[in-house]
Structure formats: structure tokens, C-alpha cells
Amino acid sequence: MITVVVTFSIPSEVSASVLEEKFLETAPMYLETPGLVRKNYLYDRATLEAGGCYTFQDKKSAELWFNEERIAWITERYSAPDIRHFETPVIVDQDTGLIDNPGY
């Protein structure tokens, strides 16, 4: 599994409710994203940062999703993103009570 953390700056004039609306507008497309297991939208009012935390089945799926076009889309919609990829060797799931060890 691969976890991708994306952050970007939000202008101070964009309210939390407007940002939430923007997030809800895009949420349906993630139901159709190949290889995506989960996406969490992120927002920090104190630092005016937002973004997403994505869990992908594999590195290839993550790389295909975060291509040049996707980065340009994020930049146009919000601002230039910082994108970090992490291997996810162990996952603890409170909902199922399971610990998954997909390894590296």
C-alpha cells in the first residue's frame, strides 16, 4: 500500500464552509479512482492549509493518479501542492479490528 499526503495553501478569504463545498464537489470522482482505497480531506484553519490523505493499493496507481495533469488541476483549483508518497507497511483498522501487513 502507498499513502500519499497532499497539502496546499488556502487563501484567508476562503471560509471553511466554502472549502467544504469544494471538497464535496470533487468527492464523487474518488469513488471511480483506480487503485484508491480511501481518501480523507484535510484542513487546518490555523495554518490555512488543506489537502488530502490518500491510500492506494500500489505505487503505480498513486503515480498514475498524481500525473502532471492532476497536479495542474490541483494548482488551478487551490494552489501549488506539496505531494509526499509513503510506503504503508502496516495498517490498523479500528472499524474492523484488524491489523493488515501489506509489507513493502
Where are these regions (language model features)?
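A short, exposed loop/beta-hairpin motif centered on an aromatic-Gly-Thr core
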Residues: 51-54
